[in-house]
Regions:
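Short extracytoplasmic
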Residues: 26-54
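Short, basic/aromatic recognition patches
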Residues: 18-33, 207-222, 267
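Short, small/polar residue-rich loop motifs at catalytic or cofactor-binding pockets
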Residues: 32-36, 222-226, 297, 413
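Beta-lactam-recognizing serine transpeptidase/beta-lactamase-like catalytic domain environment
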Residues: 176-190, 194, 229-274, 279-514, ...
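Second-shell loop/turn segments in exported
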Residues: 26-30, 57-69, 76-80, 98-106, ...
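Small/polar-residue-rich segments within soluble enzyme cores
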Residues: 10, 51-54, 60-61, 65, ...
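Conserved, well-ordered alpha-helix/loop/beta-strand core segments that scaffold catalytic motifs
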Residues: 183-227
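Hydrophobic alpha-helical transmembrane signal-anchor segments
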Residues: 1-18
Length: 557
């Protein structure tokens, strides 16, 4: 518009000289609309919210205006008081000569942001923002994960499902006058922001609470360095609880140590000790190296093999294979695995999933250690079968035992039940997936019977028993490896099993790192297994198995 024409139009419309200046400075601007991240829900009937976005405000400053109006110190003092910040921190954000933009503080709640607005400070404004919020703080922290400062998932489901959870920002392209007032009738583009998809987990908040409470009791009672538990549906691979200690507050993840951030259920590798015997003996039975009633000489507690002495915790003479499982004889198991041979032992452990990631839909899973047979020493076959010289994660060990419960079929564990878009479309649905067969259904049936004897009188896992239900499982007490040998004071205690033994529904593993002073799996981990199993069976209303005449099986207590 020419200068003369513009002045004539201004006079005709009655526009003042100041307003004429604002009109003259009309310009086009773009503004991003912040997207909302999807929510995370548990898998219970109540669909409890585990993570969501809250609407908050960021405090934005134009330092040049504050300096020009000599209000820098006043703004610093008032904002620091309202926001509960150190004055030096606020001053550091505001005292920037020549700058037109500075973010003073983030994530202001309604009351605080209104108080900032009421200050009426020139050069201070509020900008809409969102904050990721976790209603239950540390509860289920290792599974949920957190959103880092860049707005990207930093661990757990937040990281693994980030592509689904994150939304898409919108865009408003419009025109503003010299006072930065938008001329709405001149809007060029208006693309709304798209909310991210919601994630529904297989985890049940109620069972998770049972697991976490049991872990806290274990940590306190045994002064452990760490403890973790997983509960899995044996037929499907659904994870209904996964907890790890120590834990951290998701709303204050920056204060957490690396030890607290670690999800030990999938990210901590340890030598399993005697829980591995369930797999190696299953392999021997499947290859018909022996039968359940085959008798082996357990050498009264000391066996010289390949120049090395292998000992039992208690000395035994002649034991059947069934009693080798029940008594957890190192020597009896080692004799079976030596007869089986290194190649076959390695093949079966691989079939069970040892040495490979399970493929669970969570980041941070370790694959454990199962060396190729060519790297085995002359005693490896006798030691790996009893859980030495091989390392696993708790999820690997549990998933392998669940295969025995599931007629020999290995399932892929999963934790995401469903992904639903903001407009209600199901984008992904978790489903049971068979990985392969580890042993025959006949061998699996025999192993279930043998493992159920572990919790009967005279077995190593009597403290894992559950009233009115049969329990199958295996204890583990493993010395921690140090400097090419094994510690005489640091142990990993565990119990892994499934219930009911007669008609398996749930697999559970409890692992405790460096309990003191007692350190055996049967004393430290088995009671926690019993507590979780008892409460979970009741919660899921899993019926007490009945024998053929219709009567209930008698209590194991």
């Amino acid at each position: 518009m020419g200068g003369l024409a513009y002045r004539l139009l201004s006079l005709h419309l009655g526009i003042s000289a100041t307003d004429r200046d604002h009109v003259a400075r009309i310009r086009r601007v773009e503004r991003l609309l912040r997207e909302r991240r999807g929510r995370i829900y548990d898998g219970s009937r109540d669909a409890n919210i585990l993570a969501l976005d809250l609407e908050v405000k960021d405090v934005i400053a134009d330092p040049s205006i504050l300096l020009a109006n000599n209000e820098l110190e006043l703004a610093t003092e008032q904002i620091a008081e309202v926001a509960g910040l150190d004055e030096a921190e606020v001053m550091g954000a505001l005292d920037r000569p020549g700058r037109r933009y500075a973010r003073v503080c983030r994530n202001m709640q309604d009351e605080q942001s209104e108080a900032i607005r009421d200050l009426g400070l020139r050069g201070i404004s509020l900008r809409d923002a969102t904050k990721r919020y976790y209603p239950h703080n540390s509860f289920m922290c290792h599974v949920i994960g957190f959103l880092n400062g860049e707005g990207v998932g930093g661990s757990g489901v937040e990281q693994g499902m980030n592509g689904f959870l994150r939304g898409c920002p919108g865009l408003v392209e419009s025109v503003v006058d010299g006072r930065r007032r938008e001329l709405y009738d001149r809007r060029v583009q208006d693309i709304p922001a798209k909310t991210g998809a919601d994630i529904c987990l297989t985890l049940d908040q109620n069972v998770q609470y049972m697991a976490e409470r049991a872990l806290d009791e274990v940590m306190e009672r045994h002064g452990a360095k760490g403890a973790w538990v997983i509960v899995e549906r044996v037929r499907t691979g659904e994870i209904v609880a996964m907890a790890s200690r120590p834990s951290y507050d998701l709303n204050d993840f920056g204060a957490a140590s690396q030890e607290e951030l670690l999800n030990r259920a999938i990210g901590f590798v340890y030598e399993p000790g005697s829980t591995m015997k369930a797999l190696s003996i299953a392999a021997a039975l499947n290859e018909r190296i022996a039968e359940r009633d085959t008798i082996l000489n357990c050498e009264d507690g000391a066996w010289l093999h390949q120049g090395k002495v292998l000992r039992d915790y208690h000395p035994y003479g002649r034991l059947t294979v069934a009693d080798i499982v029940k008594k957890s004889s190192n020597i009896g198991t080692a004799k079976l695995t030596v007869s089986l041979g290194a190649q076959k032992l390695s093949e079966y452990l691989t079939r069970f999933g040892i040495g490979s990631k399970t493929g669970i839909d969570l980041p941070g899973e370790e694959q454990g250690i199962l060396h190729p047979v060519r790297r085995w020493s002359r005693i490896s076959c006798s030691r790996i079968g009893i859980g030495q010289g091989v390392s696993v994660t708790a999820l690997q060990m549990l998933n392998a035992l669940c295969a025995i419960a599931n007629d020999g079929v290995v399932m892929r564990p999963y934790i995401v039940s469903r992904v639903v878009s903001s407009d209600g479309v199901v984008l992904h649905e978790g489903r049971p997936k068979e990985v392969g067969r580890a042993i025959s259904s006949q061998t699996a049936s025999i192993m279930r019977q043998l493992l159920s004897r572990v919790t009967e009188a005279g077995g190593t896992g009597t403290r894992a028993r559950v009233r009115n239900y049969s329990v199958a499982g295996k204890t583990g007490t493993a010395q921690k490896p140090i400097d090419g040998g094994y510690s005489s004071s640091a142990y990993v205690a565990s119990f892994v099993g499934f219930v009911p033994a007669d008609a398996p529904e749930l697999g559970i593993i409890v692992v405790v790192d460096e309990p003191q002073p007692l350190h055996t799996g049967g004393v430290v981990a088995a009671p926690a297994f019993s507590t979780i199993a008892s409460e979970a069976l009741s919660y899921f209303d899993i019926p007490v198995p009945r024998i053929h005449d219709g009567t209930e099986i008698a209590s194991t207590h």
